[in-house]
């Protein structure tokens, strides 16, 4: 297992080199490309980066020692950061992105949370509606009665059939032919659920065929020690 983890880490390190070179090229030679080519190249880069991150996090989830760093995170601002990281994917699909709620703070690991957000955004792009302007909305609320922060991420995409909903977090599950998940590898939502479990974030999905999908992330209540 240790050799496997080491191999994955080294492989990811090596593939990030051409991705970094690609980023440098896209930044420095933008004027030499047509806007369409530049946008498409950004899309390819970000899509490749997401696939690499999936492999990396899949290997890390099975590790004995995990280097999570829990800190206060402004949830809405972190969502905006994740959108910025995936902007080329969203722009290529002509997405409308909106936000609501207060910028509540929750305790979590930023890298792990950003990975979750990236996978959810990627799914929204992959299964965007074709008969309307694709849209994704981030909403944060603070349930003061139970001390929990709730983040809802809603899109207006193709949705998930009711028969598939109980299995969307199963490893390798891709749904029926033509469904929301049929074009996927069956790993994205599995990794999201595993990462959420590690970070003690409760995750729920509500969806209807052609009715969009809502992912709800509930952050745990953290008891703060009283000052002396």
PLM region spans:
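Short helix-loop "hinge" at the ATP-lid/N-box region of the Bergerat-fold HATPase_c
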Residues: 124-128
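Short conserved segment of the HATPase_c
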Residues: 160-172
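Short beta-strand/loop element within the Bergerat-fold HATPase_c
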Residues: 133-147
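Short conserved segments within the C-terminal catalytic ATPase subdomain
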Residues: 89-99
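Acidic ATP/Mg2+-coordinating residue in the GHKL
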Residues: 155
């Amino acid at each position: 297992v240790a050799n496997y983890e080491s191999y994955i880490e080294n492989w990811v390190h090596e593939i990030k080199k051409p991705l970094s070179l690609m980023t440098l090229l896209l930044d420095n030679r933008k004027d030499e490309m047509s806007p369409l080519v530049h946008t498409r190249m950004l899309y390819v880069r970000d899509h490749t980066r997401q696939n690499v991150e999936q492999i990396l996090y899949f290997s890390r989830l099975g590790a004995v020692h995990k280097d999570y760093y829990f800190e206060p995170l402004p949830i809405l601002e972190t969502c905006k950061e994740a959108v910025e990281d995936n902007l080329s994917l969203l722009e290529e699909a002509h997405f409308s992105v909106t936000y609501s709620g207060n910028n509540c703070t929750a305790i979590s690991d930023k890298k792990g949370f950003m990975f979750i957000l990236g996978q959810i955004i990627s799914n929204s792009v992959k299964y965007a509606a074709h008969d309307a302007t694709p849209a994704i909305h981030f909403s944060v609320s603070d349930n003061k009665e139970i001390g929990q922060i709730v983040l809802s991420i809603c899109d207006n995409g193709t949705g998930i059939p009711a028969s598939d909903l109980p299995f969307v977090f199963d490893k390798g599950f891709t749904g029926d032919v033509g469904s929301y998940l049929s074009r996927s590898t069956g790993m994205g939502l599995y990794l999201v659920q595993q990462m959420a479990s590690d970070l003690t974030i409760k995750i729920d999905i509500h969806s209807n065929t052609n009715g969009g999908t809502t992912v709800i992330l509930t952050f745990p209540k953290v008891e703060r020690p009283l000052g002396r």
